[in-house]
UniProtKB/Swiss-Prot annotation:
Belongs to the UPF0297 family. PANTHER family: UPF0297 PROTEIN YRZL. Pfam families: IreB (PF06135). InterPro entries: IreB. This is UPF0297 protein Cphy_2298.
Length: 88
């Protein structure tokens, strides 16, 4: 039996940092593979917050719920601006 005066240590392993771009890529692929229109489904999720817009295929629903919807929108806006507006 351990002595009651000793302190036990509990170490929590750091979760790998989630990259929003990678989440979007995986979700897009999963939705496409299941035959859904990925744009409609992702927009539905962003607008409503309802995760049932996203398939469970490839763990996409769980992944997308790990990032904030505003972070997804921000990533999409950065991509659009960088690739369409800054070139003009």
């Amino acid at each position: 039996m351990q002595e009651i005066n000793n302190t036990q240590y509990f170490r929590v392993q750091k979760q790998p940092e989630i990259v929003v771009k990678d989440v979007i890529d995986i979700v897009y692929l999963a939705l496409t593979e299941k035959g859904y229109n990925p744009v409609n489904q992702i927009v539905g999720y962003i607008m409503s917050g309802d995760p049932t817009y996203i398939t469970n295929h490839r763990n996409a629903r769980s992944l997308i719920m790990k990032v904030e919807r505003d972070e997804i929108l921000e990533e999409l806006m950065h991509y659009y601006i960088d690739n369409h507006l800054k070139r003009r």
